[in-house]
């Protein structure tokens, strides 16, 4: 979701780069899989900086990712920029484990900790919005500083190309903190169809994620994050995007208006 945008920005700036992907199909792409460490050498050869995105089909990020990052460090990679989450402190599960390792071992590093992606409305919530006109979460009335993936990517490019290493983490948000009730109202106003938010229990939320193919640990972690949002953990706005990229972050209503057809085309089947 952010990697392609980072690559496009680097290409536009004339900065040499390569994209590590499970299914390389274009120039500049090389085979890479966190579960296949032998592939890493080709992806990392000659690299001075890396943008790190964790696998989304598993939750044991420290065990899987750190050995490859150790190899990257040993092979001359100087700067590490990790995409993590506003919910994960260094040493926490998943990307938090990788955050702690990078901060302890890399000479040049940055960890981006965005709040919830606006693009989640186009992916994990799209089917329920189109078919049932509903968003399901366990966030209650809690608010998030929803952020556009393009703003995260712009911050990642700044971290990769800055003359000086940041050597810290940054909490990234959009310009306003909103509840999912307010998100549903924004969708209703833009799309011209009624969309509502249905509040689930944490366990029911985890069950929905498992039904969509997530492993149990990942599903439970995401559902627990929703409960923390309900308790107010994400009710904040930071100004890191504007300060680090010198551009204002995208507002949710503008994001919805700019992508309206994604929710108004023929409903998804299956």
Residue spans for each PLM region:
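Oxidoreductase cofactor-interface core, primarily capturing Rossmann-like NAD(P)-dependent enzymes
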Residues: 1-23, 27, 35-37, 45-47, ...
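Conserved Rossmann-like nucleotide-binding pocket used by diverse enzymes
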Residues: 30
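A hydrophobic C-terminal alpha-helical subdomain
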Residues: 203-270
């Amino acid at each position: 979701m952010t990697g392609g945008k980072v690559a496009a920005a680097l290409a536009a700036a004339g900065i040499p780069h390569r994209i590590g992907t499970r299914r390389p199909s274009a120039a500049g792409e090389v085979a890479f899989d966190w579960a296949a460490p032998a592939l890493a050498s080709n992806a990392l050869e000659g690299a001075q900086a890396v943008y790190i995105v964790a696998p989304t089909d598993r939750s044991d990020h420290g065990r899987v990712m750190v050995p490859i990052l150790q190899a990257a460090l040993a092979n001359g990679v100087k700067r590490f920029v990790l995409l993590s989450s506003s919910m994960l402190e260094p040493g926490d599960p998943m990307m938090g484990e990788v955050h702690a390792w990078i901060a302890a071992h890399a000479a040049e590093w940055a960890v981006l900790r965005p709040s919830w992606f606006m693009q989640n409305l186009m992916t994990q919530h799209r089917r329920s919005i189109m078919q049932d006109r509903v968003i399901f979460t366990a966030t209650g009335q809690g608010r998030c500083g929803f952020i556009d993936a393009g703003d995260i990517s712009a911050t990642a490019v700044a971290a990769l190309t800055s003359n000086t290493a940041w050597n810290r983490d940054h909490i990234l948000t959009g310009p306003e903190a909103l509840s999912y009730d307010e998100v549903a109202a924004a969708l209703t106003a833009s799309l011209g169809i009624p969309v509502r938010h249905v509040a689930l229990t944490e366990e029911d939320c985890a069950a929905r994620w498992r039904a969509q193919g997530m492993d149990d640990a990942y599903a439970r972690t995401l559902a627990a994050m929703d409960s923390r949002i309900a308790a107010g953990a994400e009710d904040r706005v930071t100004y890191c995007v504007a300060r680090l990229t010198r551009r204002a972050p995208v507002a949710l209503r503008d994001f919805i208006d700019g992508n309206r057809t994604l929710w108004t085309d023929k409903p998804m089947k299956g």
